Structure formats: structure tokens, C-alpha cells
Swiss-Prot record:
One of its GO terms (biological process) is biotin biosynthetic process. It catalyses: 6-carboxyhexanoyl-[ACP] methyl ester + H2O = 6-carboxyhexanoyl-[ACP] + methanol + H(+). The gene is bioH. The active site is at S82 (nucleophile), D207, H235. Pfam families: Abhydrolase_1. The keyword Cytoplasm applies. Belongs to the AB hydrolase superfamily. Carboxylesterase BioH family. Keywords: Biotin biosynthesis, Cytoplasm, Hydrolase, Serine esterase. This is Pimeloyl-[acyl-carrier protein] methyl ester esterase. Pathway: Cofactor biosynthesis; biotin biosynthesis.
């Protein structure tokens, strides 16, 4: 069995890497890939433990990074959704020669809420962790519903996510658990000033997992970065508003 991550590479142009979020896999980007293929050489990966990389595992951001480094292009634009945004930010901080520009999508340097920071309530994360041990299939489906909640097209969004995720092998429970621990524990806020490359932060106005207040807080922490808010989207703007999403990426890449 291969010890390499599953990468799908297609298209022509500057290198652009797409990282999915927790419980998902690279198939979630299909709508985006079809639109961006004429403009970029796209590198879509199944992170360790997910999709066609389900037989692999990584317990930390750096372990994920080490597996990505084996086949990742250098000087690429990195686009990370949700947990994938944490991975992309980690790459930008610790392996900057691979990241020419950084794009985070519905992501946060710290996902768990605390007194003066908006985010996912710790009890929600611990409930997901408990459910995982009972039935990880149902847990992932619940997470999909949570990601789409609030979007006017929530039902269709969930359908699209399910179609994508279930088209590939199921994630392994060990990696799902490790991912939840990262969402609960990782805090990159103090490291953000060390980011040197151009950065674009994309948010869904209706997102229940990464509240829009996070965008305002990060505007102060990252004054040189750009941000855009998708008005009709919840946690998956590239599913809800794919045309607008691709327009933002093309515009940012061209700068």
C-alpha cells in the first residue's frame, strides 16, 4: 500500500494547492477545479486519513506538513478550507519557500472559542469527539449539516458535500479524532505577524463555525492581508457561491 498522499494534478498555469477541511476530501473542490483549470496548474490533495489517503495518519499540523512536502510544488498559491486553512497557515509559517501566496477559506487561527475570542464552543467539539467513538459516519454527516446551516441553499450544499465525500473511501476514525483535537487545541494567533507572503482571507457571512467577528479581529492582527465576505454563504462558500469564489481567487492570484 502506498505511503504517499493522493494528489490529483490538472490544468495549466501557476501552481495552486487546494486543501480540504475536517471529515472531507479533495472531491469537495470539483466545482472549483472545473472553473479554475484553464488558469492554474491545480494540485488537489486528500489529506492523511481522508479519501484516497485514508490508510495514512498524521497527529499534528507538522506531521501533515511533512507528508505534503513529499510532493507539494514550491512557490505555489495555497488555498486551505477550515482545518485545511490551519494546515496552509502552518505551511506558510514553517515552510515558506513552498507558499508564494496564502488563501484561507472559512478558517481561523484558533477554532475553539474562549472568553475574548469567537469560535466553536468547546462543548460542541467535545460532543463531536464523543459521537465519533459511537458512529463516525453520522458524526461526519452532522458536521456537514452544521457547515451548511444558515445558507439559503443549505439543502443543496449538504447534498453536494455528501456526494463529494462519499465518492471516495471513508476517513479513518483515528485521523478524524486527531483533526478534532487540532480544532480544539491549535492556536496560531501569536504567529500571524511572522507571515510574510500576500494573504487573502475568505469568509461566509452566515458561518456558524467561524463567526464573522473573527474577520474583524484578524483585520487588526493582519493589516496587510485582504479579506472578502460571501454574503449568501455559510461555512462552504466555494460550494454555495462557486463563481464568486473563483473570481476572488483569480483576482488575488493576478496581483
Amino acid at each position: 500500500m502506498s505511503t504517499d498522499l493522493h494528489w490529483q494534478t490538472q490544468g495549466q498555469g501557476p501552481d495552486l494547492v487546494l486543501l480540504h477541511g475536517w471529515g472531507m476530501n479533495g472531491a469537495v473542490w470539483q466545482q472549483v477545479v472545473e472553473r479554475l483549470e484553464p488558469h492554474f496548474r491545480l494540485h488537489v490533495v486528500d489529506l492523511p486519513g481522508y479519501g484516497h489517503s485514508a490508510h495514512l495518519h498524521a497527529a499534528s499540523l507538522e506531521e501533515i506538513a511533512q507528508q505534503l512536502l513529499e510532493h507539494a510544488p514550491k512557490q505555489a498559491i495555497w488555498v486551505g478550507w477550515s482545518l485545511g486553512g490551519l494546515v496552509a497557515t502552518h505551511m506558510a509559517l514553517h515552510h515558506a519557500d513552498y507558499v508564494s501566496k496564502l488563501v484561507t477559506v472559512a478558517s481561523s487561527p484558533k477554532f475553539a472559542a474562549e472568553a475574548r475570542w469567537r469560535g466553536i464552543q468547546p462543548q460542541v467539539l467535545s460532543a463531536f469527539t464523543e459521537q465519533l467513538s459511537e458512529d463516525f459516519h453520522i458524526t461526519v454527516e452532522r458536521f456537514m449539516a452544521l457547515q451548511a446551516m444558515g445558507s439559503p441553499s443549505a439543502r443543496q450544499d449538504v447534498k453536494n458535500l455528501k456526494q463529494a465525500v462519499f465518492s471516495r473511501p471513508q476517513p479513518n476514525p483515528q485521523s478524524l479524532l486527531a483533526g478534532l483535537q487540532m480544532l480544539a487545541e491549535v492556536d496560531l494567533r501569536d504567529h500571524l505577524p511572522h507571515l510574510t507572503m500576500p494573504m487573502l482571507r475568505l469568509y461566509g457571512r452566515l458561518d456558524g463555525l467561524v463567526p464573522i467577528k473573527v474577520a474583524q479581529d484578524l483585520e487588526k492582527a493582519l493589516p496587510a492581508s485582504e479579506q472578502f465576505i460571501f454574503t449568501q454563504s455559510s461555512h462552504a462558500p466555494f460550494i454555495t457561491e462557486p463563481e464568486s469564489f473563483c473570481h476572488q481567487l483569480l483576482s488575488f492570484a493576478g496581483k
